[in-house]
Every structure is written in structure tokens, then in C-alpha cells.
Amino acid sequence: FTQKMLIRQAEHRDIEAIMSIVRSAQLALSELGIDQWQNGYPSTEVIKQDIDCGVGYVACANDGKVVGYEAVVLTGEEAYTQIEDEKWHTSNNYVVVHRLCVLSDVRRSGIAIKLMRFAEEHALKHGIRDFRIDTHEGNVVMRRMLEKHGFSHCGMIYLESGDPRVAYGVEIL
């Protein structure tokens, strides 16, 4: 996938395309035996809320097709106030990426990394240098990508539902 990539704020007209990407990610996780995103999450309502709050972003191919999605949150994450086993690198303000997903046809082509870099740049524009993210313990593809790109394992956090997640962090340079 060598096309140029435009990353822009998601709009309500993107919801159908975003949900198609979400469904393809749910299927991929299911095929890997990972129970992440298997209970109707993220729902259309969650994506609408991201868009309404101004935190949803889409990656678009040259032809305008939406091929990736993420929520870039600069206001913290309630689940990150308690971390088990280890600790966050800093107690500074931080950016969190949620709901990172890429269309199955173009997976493993660097789109997720471009979305992550966009989140870093967005954070830096707001004076934030700490980047945090979490994923399901069984999501080894995501965990490898994070580790490959400088993220360190910081411990375990628990979502509002009580589900555990592996937490990662990195200082944005």
C-alpha cells in the first residue's frame, strides 16, 4: 500500500465506512481467538460519540476511501488512574489512542503506524509528550507493533467493565 495517506477528523458521513473497518477488525480478532471487541464494542454509538467529541480520525487513501480509524484523546483515561504490576513512565498529561483499526484489505501496510504518528504530532501540538495505549493481552499483533515502535510495557489496567488490558507507554520525542 504505497498511496499517500490523508488523516483527517472523522465526520458523521464516515460512520458507515468506519463501522465496516470495525467489523473487519472484529472478525480478524475472532479468527485469532482473541475475545477483544467481540461483544458489540465499539458500537456505532461509541463512534458517533468520538466524532461528536472531536476525537475521531480517519485515514483515507488517495481515492478518499476510509481505510483506518482511531480515537485520539488528550483529556486522559479514567481506567489509567490505577495500574497494576508496574507504573506509567511519568505523571504528566498524556495522549491516549483508542479504537485503532485498519481495513482488512490493507492491514500490515503501515496505516496503523501512520495513525499512531498522527496522534503523536497532534499531542505535541498541544504540548503533550506522553503517549499511552492499552490492548488485550492476546492481541500479539498490536503488542508487537507497539514494542517495535518504542512503547514499553507499563503494567495492567482494568476497563470500566472490569476487563484487564495490557498498558503501554512512550515519551514522544
Question: Where do the language-model regions lie?
Answer:
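Conserved acetyl-CoA-binding loop-helix of GNAT-fold acetyltransferases
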Residues: 102, 108-121, 144, 148
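Conserved catalytic-core motifs of GNAT/GCN5-like acyltransferases
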Residues: 74, 134-135, 147-166
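Conserved GNAT-fold acetyl-CoA-binding loop/helix
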Residues: 19, 26-46
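Conserved beta-strand-loop-alpha-helix junction that forms the acyl-donor binding cleft
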Residues: 107, 133-143, 161
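Conserved GNAT acetyl-CoA-binding A-motif
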Residues: 116, 123-135
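Conserved acyl-donor/pantetheine-binding loop and adjacent beta-alpha core of acyl/acetyltransferases
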Residues: 71-101, 107
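A short beta-loop-alpha structural element at the N-terminal edge
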Residues: 6-20
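Conserved active-site alpha-helix within GNAT-family acetyltransferase domains
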Residues: 113, 125, 137-155
